[in-house]
Amino acid sequence: KFVVFSFEYMTRNEYLHTERFEFEGGGSIDGLKVVYHTSENGWRKGDTRKVIWICHALTANSDAEDWWPELVGKGKFFDTEKYFVICVNMLGSSYGSSGPASVNPETGKPFYFDFPLVTVRDIVRANILVRKHLGIDRIDLMVGGSIGGFQSVEWAVMEPETIRNLALIACSCRATPWLTAWEESQRMALE
């Protein structure tokens, strides 16, 4: 059976941070850019819709309607008309948010290996910048898969008064030594 999905209920947005962004592991950048997708009807002050914040997995992007078409969109489980649905592109990825392929304003060339090491806490801090920019005071449901799940856990620790509920997929609250070694071997393979 061939299924055609219509992707028209999420809108791409960009947030440009005007202050220097300091990374947890050291280093900083000016002009941090964070790309995100939201329900077509944006968030306004006094909005009463429930907020669903999706933290994507490593290889996805902020267009959750594109990679999760069965769940995100008008009339779907994460109904973009009934709820305010948002997904922020992960800091350091290649889908628009600042990362190694971004141009270093000091050199005029891509950062590549000079881009600061990005931690989960850095990713969450970039998400929090977008949350504050939009004026969102509460997140009714945060959904995160894989590294998005780790972001969700970290965010719940950083802002427990903001996050009401978590739905975590393929993640845990801590990494075992085996998992740490496995991830390091993957990182080494990429280098």
Each model region followed by its residue ranges:
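Aromatic (phenylalanine/tyrosine) cluster motif
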Residues: 2-9
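Ligand-binding pocket scaffold of soluble enzyme catalytic domains
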Residues: 9-191
